[in-house]
């Protein structure tokens, strides 16, 4: 069982959900920071069958922010170079916690499911910035294939090891990668390089990896991006 606290938004219709979106917030944020977006998505008729699970990261010191404790999925040592030192232990620990949450959906033991089971192939793992990095790792390494990954303003960590960490079923992973080209925090180039790595180094199918660019968008989200995310969800976890 995962130790993470979650905010859960179930279908308004009261019907049993047939799909789940996990969405992980960024550094220093919480589930509350993305609850409005989740509520908006849940109100779309095409996504009325989806339940939204927003986990909260543990509070821990962050080297990049002078060691200040804050909600963080892993320690960030630097963001100026994708080949720099990484908190591998922290990355893998948070990834394992998300996998536990996925397993609880599979088993029907998660909050509010009451025995109703949601298989991995009906689950999307998404996140913003630091949360998106964990989402990519989770999608590539989960023991059972998930429906997709939604990675917003983020990058793929552990690139030197991911080829050995990934599961064979991740070869068919569907990825929604999105980034603003004016991002001063996580460089737009990092999103581009992540997509190139997924396609060229991990051999994901071109048609399974989407890359969306939002002109003049900084390290944030925008309405157009959320509409594109909704379209991705409608495609990979459609109503049954």
UniProtKB/Swiss-Prot annotation:
One GO molecular-function annotation for this sequence? Answer: carboxylic ester hydrolase activity
Q: Which UniProt keywords apply?
A: Cytoplasm, Fatty acid metabolism, Hydrolase, Lipid metabolism, Nucleus, Serine esterase
Specify where it is mainly localized. cytoplasm
* Recorded catalytic activity of this chain's protein: S-hexadecanoyl-L-cysteinyl-[protein] + H2O = L-cysteinyl-[protein] + hexadecanoate + H(+)
Task: Tell me which EC number(s) this protein carries.
Answer: 3.1.2.-, 3.1.2.22
Q: Coiled coil located at which positions?
A: none
InterPro entries, alphabetized: AB_hydrolase_fold, LYPA1-2/EST-like, PLipase/COase/thioEstase
Say which enzyme class the record assigns: hydrolase
Q: Which GO terms describe its biological process?
A: fatty acid metabolic process
Q: Where in the cell is it found?
A: Cytoplasm; Nucleus
| GO cellular component labels | cytoplasm; nucleus
- UniProt-annotated catalytic positions: 129 (charge relay system), 183 (charge relay system), 219 (charge relay system)
Pfam families named in the record: Abhydrolase_2
Keyword Amino-acid biosynthesis: yes or no?
A: no
UniProt keyword annotation of Transmembrane present: no
Recorded family membership: Belongs to the AB hydrolase superfamily. AB hydrolase 2 family.
- Function recorded in the entry: Hydrolyzes fatty acids from S-acylated cysteine residues in proteins with a strong preference for palmitoylated G-alpha proteins over other acyl substrates. Mediates the deacylation of G-alpha proteins such as GPA1 in vivo, but has weak or no activity toward palmitoylated Ras proteins. Has weak lysophospholipase activity in vitro; however such activity may not exist in vivo.
Descriptive protein name:
Acyl-protein thioesterase 1
């Amino acid at each position: 069982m995962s130790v993470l606290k979650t905010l859960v938004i179930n279908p308004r219709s009261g019907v049993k959900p047939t799909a789940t979106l996990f969405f992980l917030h960024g550094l220093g944020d919480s589930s509350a920071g993305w609850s409005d977006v989740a509520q908006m998505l849940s109100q779309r008729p095409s996504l009325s069958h989806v339940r939204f699970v927003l986990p909260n990261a543990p509070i821990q010191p962050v080297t990049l922010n002078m060691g200040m404790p804050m909600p963080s999925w892993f320690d960030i040592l630097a963001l100026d170079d994708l080949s720099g030192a990484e908190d591998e232990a922290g990355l893998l620990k948070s990834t394992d916690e998300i996998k536990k949450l996925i397993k609880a959906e599979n088993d029907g033991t998660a909050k509010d499911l009451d025995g109703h089971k949601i298989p991995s192939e009906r689950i999307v793992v998404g996140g913003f910035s630091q949360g998106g990095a964990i989402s990519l790792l989770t999608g590539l390494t989960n023991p059972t294939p998930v429906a997709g990954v939604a990675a917003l303003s983020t990058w793929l960590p552990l690139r030197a090891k991911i080829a050995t960490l990934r599961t064979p079923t991740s070869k068919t992973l569907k990825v929604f990668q999105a980034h603003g080209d004016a991002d001063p925090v996580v460089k737009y180039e990092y999103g581009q390089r992540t997509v190139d790595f997924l396609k060229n180094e991990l051999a994901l199918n071109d048609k399974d990896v989407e890359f969306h660019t939002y002109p003049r968008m900084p390290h944030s989200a925008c309405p157009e991006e959320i509409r594109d995310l909704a379209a991705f969800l409608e495609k990979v976890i459609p109503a049954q």
